[in-house]
Amino acid sequence: MSSESKTKTFLEFQFAMLLISGNILFAKLIDESVWMITFGRTVFASVGLYLFLKWRDKPVFFTTKTDNIASLGAGVLLAVHWITFFASARLASPAVAVLTLFTHPVITVFLEPIHFASRPKKTDLFLALLVLLGVGILIPELKPGNDLFLGILSGLFSAFTFSYRNLVAKKFLSHHGSAQVMFLQSLTAAILLAPVCYWDPIPTNYRSLGLMILLGTFFTAFAHTLYMKSMFQLKLKTAGILSSIQPVYSILLAWILLGDIPGYREIIGGVLILFAGTLETIRYKKEVP
């Protein structure tokens, strides 16, 4: 990959991270259950991506059974990831949800060698542990059994499913268009979550519906498609460590839009995460094409 292509991929990836960082704000902005928010975003993401693929005259389904099964599995993982992510935000706080989610660079460093012909280098382990340290500083004191503890467990499980979904998509689906890959994952998640309509009323007020449409189309369909496109061109561990900037983006957005002022923990942890991301960015740009 040329230096120009690397720069373009890096900028696309960072823009996707900035948009995805805004997802957590909807946990506070939308007055609906975690299940309904997740179901709504998958429905509107699926519709948006379907219309985009039809407009571009692109296929919406894969032609091989293996690819469709991989897409089904990735969609299930994506649904679980989104549910546990928003559950973490409700049980603990949006900050804790974002920060525990970003233990996934550490998880990715150890998962990737299992499925790809690569071994983690000492630098990979160092950067992953640096991210973990930054996240650890950001999380306040734990007390097992309370909502904070349950929120952190939910966030960690969200991190695992997110990391494994990326691995499945990278290994089995990276030769397909990112919009098609994201459409099938969103559709699978929407079908899986459809039963929520039986016990949770569908929102009828314009505010909730409008925010769900915005979350599903722009902050999910567009943002995650751009993320998938960039991720397919990067090593998983590189994507994981570079994406560790997302907690910093989320904290800044919450500060600007919701008035949540970061404390000293957020500042110190954010600096460590930024440092790890900067080192990985420099290393990525120096790699031989």
State where each predicted segment sits.
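Helix-helix packing/entry segments at the starts of transmembrane helices
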Residues: A97-T103, A169-A189, T220-I256
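Specific alpha-helical transmembrane segments that line the substrate/conduction pathway
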Residues: M36, V43-F44, F86-R119, S158, ...
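Hydrophobic/aromatic residues within transmembrane alpha-helices
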Residues: I30, I37, R41, S88, ...
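Juxtamembrane helix-entry segments on the extracytoplasmic side of multipass membrane proteins
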Residues: K6-T9, D31-F39, F62-N68, P140-T161, ...
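Specific transmembrane alpha-helical segments of multi-pass solute transporters/efflux pumps
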Residues: Y50, R56-A95, L101, I137, ...
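Glycine-/small-residue-enriched transmembrane alpha-helix faces in small-molecule transporters
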Residues: M1-G40, V47, G73-V76, T84, ...
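Hydrophobic transmembrane alpha-helices of multi-pass small-molecule transport proteins
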Residues: L49, L53, L72, L78, ...
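Transmembrane alpha-helices of multi-pass small-molecule transport proteins
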Residues: T9, E32-V80, P105-L111, T161-R165, ...
